[in-house]
Amino acid sequence: MFSQDFFQKLTLPDLDNVTQCIRGLSRSTVISMGAIAAATTYYVAMRPKALPPICDLQMQSVEIPGGEFIHQSVLLNGDNLLTHFYDDARTLYEFFLRGARVSNDGPFLGSRKPKCAYEWMSYKEVMERSENLGSAFLHKQHSKTTDANIGIFSQNRPEWTIIELACYTYSLVSVPLYDTLGAEAINYIIDKASISTIVCDVADKVKMVLECVKDRKHTVKTIVMMATPSDELVGRGELAGIHILSLREMEAIGKANYRRPVPPQPDDMAVICFTSGTTGNPKGALLTHANIVSNCSAFIKLTQVNCPLGPGDVHVSFLPLAHMFERVVQGVMIVQGARIGYFQGDIRLLMDDLSTLKPTVFPVVPRLLNRMYDKIFGQANTPLKRWFLDFAFRKKEAEMSKGIMRRNSIWDRLVFKKVQATVGGRVRLMITGAAPISPDVLTFLRAALGCQFYEGYGQTECTAGCTMTMPGDWTAGHVGAPLPCNNIKLVDVAQMNYLAINGEGEVCVKGPNVFLGYLNDPEKTAEALDAEGWLHTGDIAKWLPNGTLKIVDRKKHIFKLAQGEYIAPEKIENVYVRSDAVAQVFVHGDSLQAYLVAVVVLDPDFLSAWTKRTMKVDGSYDALCSRADVKAAILKDMVRLGKESGLKSFEQVKAIYIHSEMFSVNNGLLTPTLKAKRNELRQYFRSQIDELYAGINKS
């Protein structure tokens, strides 16, 4: 504390009298003045600086005149949508060439063995391997015009990207497969895309393909395994008329039969990405080089000023490469000459991978963020710890509201440093998408992690994203403005009174990132793309006053209750899962019933702490799930959250069933992209739903 003498004698003297003034001060006052001067100098030098917004954050999109209520990014110069960012990078092959050049043949793809450091391949090494592999594909009679589709059935690893780049180098098309689709769907994709060569990472996937084509007519001629296949496996392949060999053998064939690259054109096909959907067979979205380049370029356009990426950046690859979200992020990293480090293949070891890799770019999905959030608050298990965590968060949140995003505040050092260390301690850019995220979770983790943290929205049919939050806008509860590569309009959903004239309706997207259609499926293509080229997403949204978009629900999931009110179930579910004790919710209703009911899965990691805190009740997970008083308390908490979020009375559930097993891909209740399979959930819980309604009708 400064001395009273200092405050009494502190004045603003003329410069001519400064020496005389100082001589008249006591020694303690002079020391105090020196201390405060030093502190002031330090503060001026180190004070946090707000990121300058790249646009007026109160007007992030503009409406195009014409009466169709079409919105466009304010980052565009004129009406032309963004097709590419770099003139020398208009295809994914050119992305790779540019990355190799700007990195000066720097490290590119990295992997690690357990408890070891990452080992890196350079851009030149990857180029050589991809050209050898691509030459082998051509030697096997693949070409741009004949038998162009190459199946990739693997977890994320460097070889995945080498195969993909081999396809791009020789104008071939990659077709990702993933085991969570199930054998029936993989069978369907192989036939639909007429795949003759499939590259698998492990023997189990080779066996799965062999089972898929067993005792039937098929197109598969070659299976390439990333490891060395056993003699027994090779023999099984021969019985099915399939040549099975290792990736190294395939590369050796290409080296011995080298072909010069056959660069693609922007409008050439790059990927056939099969989307799982919640019903029916997978649909193969046809995506060109121009589609993917425009989407990557839009991301670069948004981040180039405040968070430019380059060869010094490192991306951790763990989200499935079979999905376009991860592919677009990797495309951005490649064209900037950055590094990509792959996780070990076990999500339980991800934190160890992050600690070793120390990434600067970290794409995530809401499910992981929810777990991080729950874990942090689960550790604040005393009133004092919770108060201090809330206090530190509010201080960081206040800085964020001014556009300040940093990791060196006193609150970072005291509270959030360990949180930041869990993701490697160097992350400066994060992006989440693929599913809705709670505004509370996003805001807290933005503050805790202290990096530029964006939220995007889109789907495979528009490559990956069509909106993204702007740098400097760290508010939550929306998915940002249209990307510079596409326009967005909302169209009427009259039965729910969502009208475009009111800034509400179904999201429609048009631009160079919108796909060509579904492989050999004109009927489904016509459902998705209208005559003017607008992609109808099936999502309902509304424009906010600042030109950002807020997603409300899925159009096809809307249903009507007996008294005529329309219900958007996902909107309600997204409210209820904010309850600390709730992990998953399935809201059900139909036109024969006047009320909603729900199946609720409680969070095994946090239920016990929640019941202790709110009910003074303890017990095992199964015991707590079976208690009537716990069920009543959970329902009460859900209804409370519903009221706070503005749900109408008919949107609140009247009864719940507590289920103790998580909905998952393995039990058939979630899609591979972790979306609820509503028809399957309805059938699976039919008897419990009927009992809930019977109980309501009795009371």
Give short role names for the model-derived ranges.
Residues 2-69, 169-249, 635, 639:
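Structural core segment of the AMP-binding/adenylate-forming
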Residues 559, 584-586, 635-699:
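Conserved C-terminal "lid"/linker of ANL adenylate-forming enzymes
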Residues 120-124, 270-297:
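Conserved AMP-binding A3 loop
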Residues 84, 88, 105, 109-144, ...:
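Conserved AMP-binding/adenylate-forming core of the ANL superfamily
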Residues 44, 48, 52, 242-247, ...:
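Gly/Ser/Thr-rich phosphate-binding loop
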Residues 293-317, 321-413, 426, 448:
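Conserved AMP-binding/adenylation subdomain of ANL enzymes
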Residues 496-502, 506-561:
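Conserved ATP-binding/catalytic segment of the ANL
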Residues 104-107, 241-245, 251-274, 281, ...:
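Conserved pre-ATP/AMP-binding loop-to-beta segment of ANL
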